[in-house]
A protein has these predicted regions:
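Acidic, Ser/Thr/Pro-rich low-complexity intrinsically disordered segments
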Residues: 27-28, 50-135, 143-144
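Residue-level recognition of conserved structural "scaffold" positions that shape functional pockets
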Residues: 18, 142-143
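Predominantly extracellular/luminal regions of secreted and cell-surface proteins
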Residues: 22-44
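Bacterial Sec-dependent N-terminal signal peptides
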Residues: 1-28
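A general sequence property marking short-to-moderate contiguous segments
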Residues: 44-50
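Alpha-helical structural elements
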Residues: 1, 12, 38-40, 44, ...
Length: 144
């Protein structure tokens, strides 16, 4: 009986350890870098963003960036799964008012363009709506 309990305990520990390894293998760096080539024509690359929801343990990933007035910004999303895999991108101005999102009426869009009309700090949040992988990458580009 002790052997059975011991083997069962070891199996549970091994399962928990392997689950943690799976979460750690998001590959957000590679996905963000792969996103660069998918930047829309006419936009100049600015920055990549890693989107690692740690297998669902993290509900939100947030970044900030200074945007300039009279500049258009393009933000795209990439991942290994289908389309955006439930990654919702929401952009907020310095007053935390929503100015743009890639999710509208139940549909996810792989990219969004934001025409900036006020220079300031903008917040870019990535959340997960029915995501399978909780992992992806994103690229920010601009044009004047």
């Amino acid at each position: 009986m002790r052997k059975v309990i011991y083997i069962l305990s070891l199996s549970i520990v091994a399962l928990m350890f392997s689950a943690n390894i799976i979460h750690a293998q998001c590959g957000a760096d590679a996905q963000a870098n792969a996103c660069i080539s998918k930047l829309q024509d006419g936009f100049t690359f600015l920055k990549t963003f890693k989107v690692d929801g740690q297998g669902g343990a993290k509900a939100k990933v947030e970044y900030s960036y200074v945007f300039s007035k009279d500049t258009q910004y393009y933000l795209n999303i990439c991942n290994d799964g289908a389309d955006t895999d439930g990654i919702v991108v929401t952009m907020y101005d310095s007053k935390r008012q929503v100015v743009s999102t890639n999710y509208n009426k139940g549909k996810f869009y792989a990219g969004m363009i934001y025409p900036c009309n006020a220079t300031g700090i903008y917040y870019i949040t990535f959340t997960f709506e029915g995501s399978q992988n909780y992992c992806g990458g994103s690229v920010l580009g601009f044009k004047r």
